[in-house]
């Protein structure tokens, strides 16, 4: 029941509290959908993986990243540390599973996604990107440091 109560708690928080409260929130639950390489759904809650960029679906690398991630984490339990930000309909955070560890670091190591420097100012994915080599995908302008 921990999974259901964790999801219910975050949903209830979202109804009554400002977005800034999510800064310390942790969400644990089953991965129910992989939208693309850098967006998953935990329960019905969409999470944008912070500090990561992946090519869009409809591109060769984007489709590979999405299919790979789907094969690795669907129905697995993910724990996401939310940072209090929101982009479109998604909360933003870093997620991990018992099987993969940090999902972003794993996707970088597989050379399917890259470090988005602007949103990884703490350098969490810096070593993973150095080990993986240069990201072969398209680096969006919003990933460059300000």
Regions found by a protein language model. Give the residues of each.
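Small beta-barrel nucleic-acid-binding modules, primarily SNase/OB-fold domains
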Residues: 2, 18-146
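Bacterial N-terminal signal peptides
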Residues: 9-18
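Bacterial N-terminal signal peptides that target proteins for export
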Residues: 1-10
């Amino acid at each position: 029941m921990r999974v259901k109560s964790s999801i219910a708690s975050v949903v209830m928080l979202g109804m009554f509290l400002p977005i800034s409260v999510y800064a310390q929130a942790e969400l644990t639950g089953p991965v129910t959908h992989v939208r693309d390489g850098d967006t998953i759904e935990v329960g019905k809650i969409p999470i944008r993986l912070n500090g990561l960029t992946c090519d869009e679906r409809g591109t060769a690398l984007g489709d590979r990243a999405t299919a790979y991630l789907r094969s690795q984490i669907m129905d697995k339990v993910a724990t996401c540390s939310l940072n209090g930000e929101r982009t479109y309909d998604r909360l933003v955070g870093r997620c991990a599973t018992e099987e993969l560890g940090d999902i972003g670091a794993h996707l970088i190591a597989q050379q399917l996604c890259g470090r988005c420097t602007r949103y990884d100012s703490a350098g969490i994915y810096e070593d993973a990107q150095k080990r993986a080599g240069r990201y072969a995908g398209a680096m969006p302008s919003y990933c460059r440091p300000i």
